[in-house]
């Protein structure tokens, strides 16, 4: 992002979703303020709590009360970036200065003066309570595996969002006149998240797909994937689901299906494609 920021002057710089267990809120704030300074105020920081398999298995941290931990993390991040005074915080998950230890910790604040006192935060979330937390505390929400036709499942979560709240949906886009071939690629992605990106007893991606009306298929996908039958798991992803979660097919078809996204609460598309021509095509349609 620092390199992209140095080569551009207008576009915003988004991080996608940084797992909050990977960085303390003070460390994340220092990095964000530096990037925002170098880009003259163009950073949008995406954050997310991840899941227990990653948090406990990779970062070696406990995973209790993720909503409360996220709330505390955001509060500290905001205070550091605001740079109004040395930061003191006494929470359940974070304490600044640390209680105990050598007893030498003291409240501190940034040396660098931010170009903005508030850097936009976008919360990656799938659970209804987590989405509601994002609508309360953040400038935006980054959903994935969401259908523009079924976003009413978040009606209550988004009921009190501010008028300028951003919803930046992650959408795979594949321009291909062979629709079945395009959807097969989407099915592999969706099937991997439903089947493998979480434990059998705790998988927020599977839960989200189930809440959108594909519970029976989600159960089958997870069962096949965990049995080592990945190809069968991917094939078990319904065409309807893969199609709704993506933009696939000819340019004319994609152009038609873009209308559903435009009519939904989504305000921005995070386009997933390695193809520059596809990005250019979508820019012409959306901008």
Q: Predicted regions: what is each one?
A:
Residues 1-287:
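Active-site-adjacent structural elements that line small-molecule/cofactor binding pockets in enzymes
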